[in-house]
């Protein structure tokens, strides 16, 4: 049996966040008596909760100028002090249940080097869960499945991996987008297969607001820290569609859709680059015609989009027709000797 060290970076324990974070931590404790739990950071209430629930505490962690924790500092310290070989980084609002434990046991018994990750299920939880109720897990799972809000493959909230896998981590900050997709990319880049456990594990995300950020949801997803995270991963980005295996019905199966999904992403990227390249090339013509790039999603923006598409598409068709006509006659343009 592979025992687990779970580590997380809680927000301040206050209000609704206090309730859902305690729910999450107590659910991890119910996975197995020997599970080790580490909370990282000195945010309000963290030390007191660690003492109350009997979990380990890493108080000091590197932060940026806004006080947001660096992912690298969290990962390096957690891997250094973890008692067990298998670690799990999970967001501190995620309730894990027995299906998660079974998934970890299955994969860790078959693979020495791996990353298990999965999509979350969004659920409204506004009160403390009753862990003394023997049916708490069945009730919560039923609520999640009935709500039926499983996130897309871009949203990953737990990562299970052997100690030492992440020996190099860029200067991402936690709580902003981008770093989770980099973790997937890095695992594949060092030869560790990814197991998508989304079909086998109901990982319950307890919904919350974004009042912890001064600019709310917009600041979390599009603020300066988010933009820095995006720049850090550049093209080093994967989703669960790139998983090597999927876990389903207690069995690991090769992800047959992996190459198709990757090809689709490359195609979309190519279309975007082609579109914006043609916009640059045709800018003088479009300006002469009084057309501008659209930044609005309203009626005017949509009209400009179709006008631009007509001009760009027409020019692209003319270019393709010229290339086809030249090469179909066996001619080579002047100055292009072969």
Task: Briefly describe each language-model feature range.
Residues 173-316:
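C-terminal catalytic/acceptor-binding lobe
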Residues 95-180:
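Conserved catalytic core of nucleotide-sugar-dependent glycosyltransferases
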Residues 45-85:
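Active-site-proximal specificity loops/subdomain of glycosyltransferases
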Residues 23-35:
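Short, acidic, metal-binding catalytic loop of nucleotide-sugar glycosyltransferases
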Residues 84-97:
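Short beta-strand-to-loop acidic/aromatic patch adjacent to the donor-nucleotide binding site
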Residues 34-44:
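Short beta-strand/loop segment that forms part of the nucleotide-sugar
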Residues 18-24, 42-44, 67, 71-72, ...:
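Catalytic phosphate/metal-binding cores of nucleic-acid and nucleotide-processing enzymes, i.e., regions
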Residues 1-22:
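N-proximal low-complexity "stem/linker" segments adjacent to membrane-targeting elements
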């Amino acid at each position: 049996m592979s025992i687990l060290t779970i580590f997380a970076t809680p927000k301040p324990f206050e209000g609704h966040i206090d309730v859902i974070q305690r729910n999450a931590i107590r659910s991890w404790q119910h996975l197995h008596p020997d599970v080790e739990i580490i909370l990282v950071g000195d945010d309000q209430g963290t030390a007191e909760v660690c003492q109350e629930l009997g979990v380990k505490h890493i108080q000091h962690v590197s932060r940026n100028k806004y006080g947001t924790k660096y992912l690298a500092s969290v990962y390096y310290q957690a891997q250094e002090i973890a008692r067990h070989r298998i670690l799990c980084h999970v967001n501190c609002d995620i309730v894990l249940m027995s299906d998660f434990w079974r998934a970890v046991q299955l994969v860790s018994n078959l693979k020495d080097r791996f990353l298990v990750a999965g999509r979350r299920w969004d659920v409204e939880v506004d009160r403390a869960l009753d862990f003394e109720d023997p049916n708490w897990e069945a009730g919560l799972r039923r609520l999640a499945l009935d709500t039926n809000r499983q996130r897309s493959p871009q949203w990953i909230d737990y990562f299970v991996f052997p100690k030492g896998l992440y020996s190099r981590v860029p200067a991402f900050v936690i709580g902003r987008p981008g770093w989770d997709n980099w973790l997937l990319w890095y695992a594949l880049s060092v030869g560790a297969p990814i197991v998508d456990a989304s079909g086998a594990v109901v990982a319950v995300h307890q919904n919350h607001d974004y009042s912890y950020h001064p600019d709310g949801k917009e600041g979390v997803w599009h603020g300066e820290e988010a933009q820095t995270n995006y720049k850090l991963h550049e093209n080093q980005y994967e989703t669960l569609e790139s998983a090597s295996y999927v876990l389903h019905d207690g069995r690991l199966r090769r992800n047959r859709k992996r190459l198709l999904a990757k090809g689709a992403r490359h195609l979309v990227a190519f279309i975007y680059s082609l579109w914006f390249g043609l916009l640059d090339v045709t800018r003088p013509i479009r300006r002469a015609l009084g057309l501008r790039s659209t930044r609005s999603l309203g009626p005017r923006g949509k009209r400009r989009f179709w006008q631009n598409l007509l001009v760009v598409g027409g020019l692209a068709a003319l270019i393709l027709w010229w290339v086809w006509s030249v090469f179909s006659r066996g001619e080579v343009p002047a100055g292009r000797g072969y």
